[in-house]
């Protein structure tokens, strides 16, 4: 039973670490992203300093692409389901 609990805690800590990353840590740079399929209806804008746990459901449940902006409002990158899966 203790082995199961230890393995569960390791997994939980990885999930917690991931959720506490900031948007800028997992985004694709703006110049490397294909913007051809983006519309206003399938995007969600966040600041680069926002933690992933605050918008992860928007990506997974609503299938939105997150537009990451800096403090001046300039787009610096994008986050899709692929970035969540690969990190």
Regions found by a protein language model. Name each.
Residues 1-87:
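Tandem CBS (Cystathionine beta-synthase) repeat/Bateman regulatory domains
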């Amino acid at each position: 039973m203790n082995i199961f609990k230890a393995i569960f805690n390791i997994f939980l800590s990885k999930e917690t670490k991931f959720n506490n990353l900031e948007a800028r840590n997992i985004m694709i740079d703006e110049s490397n992203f294909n913007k051809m399929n983006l519309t206003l209806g399938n995007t969600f804008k966040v600041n680069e300093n926002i933690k992933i746990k605050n918008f992860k459901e928007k990506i997974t449940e609503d299938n939105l692409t997150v537009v990451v902006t800096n403090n001046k409002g300039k787009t610096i990158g994008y986050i899709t389901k692929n970035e969540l899966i690969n990190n």
